[in-house]
């Protein structure tokens, strides 16, 4: 009986996997931050008529295209001098809090990357490299077109978000380096 209970206890503890649970919690938090960033960009665009990485609504003056860019406090607008996060935070439109900027720019944070191809009607994507197995699997499934994800949208940053084997659905194991992207 004691051996059986010991075996069950080991099985339950193995199934819980505290490291995986911590990584999943961090990935969930990072995904929430990505959602907040996308929402702030959308609100800024709705208010100003151009993206925060632009200096004006005129595409001949300021290109709306945003290459795959790491989101950091020193991220500067295209052709300008202002910090994009500064324009979104209390120093600008107040779409995000200064504490949000400090958190996503901190050392040890799983940094966000943002992308928009600049075409009318295209989505803005906020991406990160997941740490938990479940988020890594989801990122790989999306990149390789498996499961319920289907085909990637035409404006999705495939080259940057799905490097190496991330688009290969024949692999026996999840590759590292696939980005989890929203929306």
State where each predicted segment sits.
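Extended, hydrophobic alpha-helical segments
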Residues: 25, 37-41, 96-97, 123-128
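Membrane-proximal amphipathic alpha-helices
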Residues: 23-34
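Proteolytic processing hotspots in large secreted/extracellular or virion-associated proteins
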Residues: 110-120
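Alpha-helix exit/C-cap motif
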Residues: 14, 39-58, 94, 98-107
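N-terminal single-pass transmembrane signal-anchor helix
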Residues: 1-18
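Short, surface-exposed interaction loops/tails
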Residues: 119-183
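Acidic, glycine-rich loop-and-strand cores that form catalytic or ligand-binding grooves
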Residues: 58-111
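Charge-biased, low-complexity intrinsically disordered regions
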Residues: 7, 25, 55-58, 114
């Amino acid at each position: 009986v004691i051996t059986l209970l010991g075996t069950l206890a080991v099985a339950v503890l193995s199934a819980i996997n505290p490291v995986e649970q911590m990584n999943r919690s961090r990935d969930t938090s990072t995904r929430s931050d990505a959602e907040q960033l996308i929402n702030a960009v959308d609100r800024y665009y709705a208010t100003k008529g151009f993206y925060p990485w632009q200096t004006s609504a005129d595409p001949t003056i300021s290109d709306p295209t945003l290459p795959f860019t790491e989101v950091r406090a020193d991220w500067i607008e295209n052709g300008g001098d202002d910090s994009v996060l500064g324009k979104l935070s209390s120093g600008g439109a107040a779409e995000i809090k200064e504490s949000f900027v400090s958190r996503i720019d901190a050392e040890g944070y799983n940094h966000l990357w943002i992308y928009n191809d600049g075409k009318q009607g295209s989505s803005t994507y906020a991406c990160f490299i997941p740490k938990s197995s479940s988020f890594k699997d989801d990122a790989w499934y999306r990149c390789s077109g498996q499961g319920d994800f289907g085909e990637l949208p035409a404006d999705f940053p495939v080259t940057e978000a799905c490097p190496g084997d991330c688009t290969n659905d024949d692999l026996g194991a999840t590759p590292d380096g696939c980005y989890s992207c929203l929306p």
